[in-house]
Amino acid sequence: MEKEQVFVFIITFFSEWGWQALGKIANPVTGKVEKNLDMVQQVIDILETLREKTKGNITGEEKHLLDSVIADLQLNYVEEIKKEDKKDDKGKPEEKAG
């Protein structure tokens, strides 16, 4: 496998891991859809570190792929956090102004 292919494989691996942690795709081992938002944040942090450490050393296509994966995971992470916040708010009694 060429180095460019290895780099794309690494990005794809972390992308799949992020989508699994978002609960968007099933875990290939268990077959279950499981959500772990803390893990998503870790995956995003790893990919951002990878982007920082490879800056200037990757092709335009690799950079575009990495940037796209990070942006997609971040957007979906924020959406899932908002959903969790709405769920939490439904269980709380409303505060009345005074």
Where are these regions (language model features)?
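N-terminal intrinsically disordered, cationic/polar leader segments
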Residues: 1-45, 49, 61-87, 91-98
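Well-ordered alpha/beta subsegment
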Residues: 52-60
